[in-house]
Structure formats: C-alpha cells, structure tokens
C-alpha cells in the first residue's frame, strides 16, 4: 500500500519536473515568434502619437530590446525567486493578476465539473438500465449531438434563449452593472454563473454519458451480474447498486483526466460571457503578446492538470483496491522469465509480493 502511494507520487513529481520547463520553453518560443508588437497592442489606437524614441524607451523598460533567449533566462532567474514578472496587458505583477482572477475561474470550473459529473453519470446509468428502449436511444442521441456540437454554438444558443428571449438570466460579467464586490450578494454571483456553468457542463457530459453506459452494460452482461440475478436481485437494483459503483469508479478517473479540456473550454466560456477569470486573461495576453502572463497561466494550468490526474489515480484506487495490487502482480511474471534466477529466489519474491506462484 505505502509503496504504491510512493511510486505514484514519485511518478507524478518526475513528470512535473520535466513538463514545467518544457512548457515554459515552448510557450516562450511561440510568443517570441508571434507577429504581434507588444507595444502596439498595449498602446492601441494611440500608437501614431508615440515617437520612435518613446517606443524604444517602452521596449527597454519591458526588456523587449533584448534577444528572446536572454529574456527567457531573466524570467527563469526571477521565477526561482518567486517572481513571475510583470504583465504587459494589465500593467501589474503576474502573481497579482493570477491571485485576483483564479478564484473566478475556480468557481466556474468547479461548478461545471460537479454538474457535468452528476448529470453525465446519472444519464449514463439510466441509459444502461434501459438498454435498447426509448430512454436509451434518446440519451445516446443527445450525448452524440452534444459531443460534436461546437462550444461557442451552445453558448450562443443559451444566450439567445435564456438571456434574450426569456430574459431570465444575465449573459455578461460576474456582477450586475454598478455593483461592487463588497456590495454584492451570493445570489447575484449565482445568477451570473448559471449560463457559463450550463454551457461548460453540458459540453462535457456527452463523453461521460457514453463511457458510463458502456461500462455499466459490460458489467450487466458479465458473470458477476448473472450470479447476482440467480440470487434474486432485479436488473434495476443491479444497475443502480453494484453496477453503478463499478461504472462510476472509472468515470471519476476519466472525468478528472479531462481537467485540461475543461480549462480550454473555460477560456471560450469566459470570453463569450465576459467572466473575469484566467480564461479571459489568457485571450488578452495572447492578443497582446504578453509573455510573462501567458507563462504564469500556463504553469498554473500544468499544475492543476497534473493534480487532477493525481487525484484521479487516488480516487480510482480507493474505489477499486485491485489497482493498488496490480503493479505488484505485474512484476512477478517478468521475474519468472529470467532463466538465471533460481527457483528459491522466485519463491522469496512471490512471498514478498504476496502472490501465489504457479507450480
């Protein structure tokens, strides 16, 4: 047990060690090669009012007059000291921008993640329990349509229905106009959060529905389900009880592993609904060639995705304890294939791994 957790943590830590520098190098290279002038993107229409001397002074203040590789190593040296640099787009430290905008993105992605899991897994279980009947066909058709539908089309459809025609929900920002964060109530945040969460969660339910349905049908057609039916358990109770536990174990892993896609979808949702999170900051930094802010957001994204994968492995092993034993069982056959290993050594290895050796 302890060795399994140790191997898992070491594997994720090693992946983080090489993935963070690689992400930083690739992203900094792409930003440096982008045909965007950061000074012009920052000044905008007033660029004609700035002379060459002023433009050179701004570039020198931002360090843009130096080669890209020198700027990268300067950024890396400051990163080791805990300084992510200054954002060109917001004229503020990158760490300040991340701290101010990360809670809004976390609320959006967290609510969307939970809503997508509850709705997707519930509909997947219902489709498997009604296999071959009209609820199954209806849910499968809806999941396939949602899976291939563009996210921006879903967002615009919800805005047209709930914000324009019915006027039930707001379609912009996190608060009503003229209301500050100190004056706002929780229900005002909630009303502005409904449409972005609805868009982001529905977009992620399609693959989850199909996955849960397939896993549950495989369990219901297996020997364990036939054994339970012989003991008098009905198909509905079987699907909602042990079958759903079997399917939801892998569904948690699949859903947590899609956190990277969830962040990518949040960029689109925050842009369409003007939600003040990291997604909106990503678009502004990309269009303004704001390399320090893009690098800061990329590092946060990589850490969040790796933590999601780690949590997926932990929850999957907690739901299915066989996953904690499998890595040990896979080592024994490799030892048996070594001809120079003595039989006594193989027996000791099998005893230590608590696996019964074959005669």
Where are these regions (language model features)?
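Individual transmembrane alpha-helix segments
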Residues: 67-111
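Membrane-interfacial helix-loop-helix junctions in multi-pass membrane proteins
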Residues: 59-68, 85-90, 94, 176-193, ...
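Hydrophobic alpha-helical membrane-insertion segments
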Residues: 20-29, 145-162, 254-260
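N-terminal signal-anchor/signal peptide hydrophobic helix marking the start
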Residues: 10-16
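Membrane-water interface segments at transmembrane-helix boundaries in multipass membrane proteins
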Residues: 141-206
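Hydrophobic alpha-helical transmembrane segments of membrane transport/permease proteins
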Residues: 20-70, 166-186
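Short hydrophobic, aromatic-rich alpha-helical segments embedded in or entering the lipid bilayer
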Residues: 49-81, 273-285
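Alpha-helical transmembrane segments of integral membrane proteins
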Residues: 2-7, 20, 98-135, 151, ...
């Amino acid at each position: 047990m302890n060795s399994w957790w140790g191997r898992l943590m070491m594997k994720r830590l090693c992946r983080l060690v090489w993935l963070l520098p690689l992400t930083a190098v690739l992203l900094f290279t792409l930003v440096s090669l982008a045909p965007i002038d950061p000074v012009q993107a920052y000044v905008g229409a007033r660029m004609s009012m700035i002379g060459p001397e002023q433009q050179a002074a701004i570039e020198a203040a931002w360090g843009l007059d130096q080669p890209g590789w020198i700027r990268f190593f300067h950024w890396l040296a400051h990163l080791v000291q805990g300084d992510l640099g200054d954002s060109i787009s917001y004229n503020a430290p990158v760490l300040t921008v991340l701290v101010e905008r990360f809670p809004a993105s976390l609320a959006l992605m967290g609510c969307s993640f939970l809503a997508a899991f509850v709705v997707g897994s519930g509909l997947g279980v219902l489709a498997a329990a009604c296999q071959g009947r009209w609820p199954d066909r209806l849910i499968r058709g809806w999941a396939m349509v949602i899976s291939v539908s563009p996210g921006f089309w879903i967002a615009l459809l919800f805005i047209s229905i709930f914000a324009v025609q019915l006027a039930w929900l707001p379609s912009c920002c996190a608060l009503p106009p003229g209301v500050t964060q100190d004056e706002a109530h929780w229900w005002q945040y909630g009303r502005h959060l409904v449409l972005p969460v609805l868009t982001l969660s529905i977009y992620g339910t399609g693959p989850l529905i199909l996955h849960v349905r397939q896993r549950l049908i495989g369990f219901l057609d297996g020997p364990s389900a036939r054994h339970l039916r012989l003991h008098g358990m009905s198909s509905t109770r079987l699907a909602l009880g042990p079958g759903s536990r079997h399917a939801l174990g892998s569904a948690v892993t699949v859903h947590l592993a899609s956190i990277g896609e969830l962040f990518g979808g949040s960029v689109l949702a925050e842009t369409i609904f003007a939600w003040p999170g990291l997604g909106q900051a990503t678009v502004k930094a990309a269009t303004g060639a704001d390399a320090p802010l893009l690098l800061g957001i990329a590092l946060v994204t990589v850490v969040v995705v790796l933590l999601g994968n780690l949590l997926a492995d932990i929850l999957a092993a907690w739901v299915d304890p066989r996953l904690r034993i499998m890595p040990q069982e896979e080592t024994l056959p490799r030892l048996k294939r070594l001809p120079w290993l003595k039989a006594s050594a193989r027996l000791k290895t099998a005893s230590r791994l608590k696996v019964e050796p074959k005669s």
